[in-house]
């Protein structure tokens, strides 16, 4: 395939400058047996109509929530998205992945980010929020690094009730700086407070917990905050934002940094994203927080305006000392969350959370009454719960899929001690009929 912008003469001049005879010499470090010494096996171009048909046929191979009844969660959730969210997102003024390079000119974009930050602060009970992160997992890892920078310590405690894939991302981020990670054991679906006490020491920068946790269980943040602060460590909380419609905010419970995955706030399910990481913290840690921050100010004539503030923390000012490496930002996803929260309002948001709680309780009651199924713990939960099964989860999910039902997550792949256990999710979208259908199908399988 030819690289169109360069002429033959330009390529000749570049090769001469590099003192090589041909482009193959530029790849001499790659063994010849690993090189593709032929043209790519790509067919000719397609017309727009043909391409659209081809893409539709590929998309048709997917099995998504539009074709099934979804009881699968574990970090990505099937919540209702008001149609106005997509409409507003599609406006040309907003539809880009990039922050303007002369940001103060784009006051509308900056104001939307400022409103997003304000809403995240209201939800989390924190003083300040950034303009968004890549996703919940990277936001948590960045928060761990931030806590180490704030405390100048090099150890973090990570709850084993945190999302297993989030924990893997945290391990990856902390491996390079050589930060020690110690996992907190769990019992009855909750982090063991005694284990936290035992592992906390003067080297500990932070305790990382999830609220509600991976099993849907609601951790006692107040007690964990007391334990962490007694040793000079910070409490970092990864939250489900929908749960904050009815649960106490992490800020009220003593959290220092709050992060989470914002996909539930108006962003559709998509394998590979893009999703939305959010981060908020107390005022005193603001300068250590990664990512862009939009502030409100007044111009020389006293008119309200919005600016990117504290930019010295960012990579376009001090790349080697920047607090993060965020380039293409998640501002469009942050806008989706802003529009969603604005549309549903305070009461609507609370109602979404209450519906999740009520429908989860109904599903728990029905499924636990079935022969061959039981609840391993009696811990209070939100939106998700663990169910012990007699049949193998793999068999159950295969049978459910025949009925166009996406079943729960097989926990045995993440927690060997929970082989034969499934994690079910029930959002506000699930109807009484769908929950009863799930119970009927599970009853038939057992």
UniProtKB/Swiss-Prot annotation:
Class of enzymatic activity (EC top level): oxidoreductase
GO BP field: glycine decarboxylation via glycine cleavage system; nucleoside metabolic process
InterPro entries: GcvPA, GDC-P_N, GDC_P, PyrdxlP-dep_Trfase, PyrdxlP-dep_Trfase_major, PyrdxlP-dep_Trfase_small
GO terms for MF: glycine dehydrogenase (decarboxylating) activity
CDD domains given in the database record: GDC-P (cd00613)
Pfam families found in the cross-reference section: GDC-P
Membrane-crossing residue ranges in chain numbering: none
EC number: 1.4.4.2
Protein name: Probable glycine dehydrogenase (decarboxylating) subunit 1
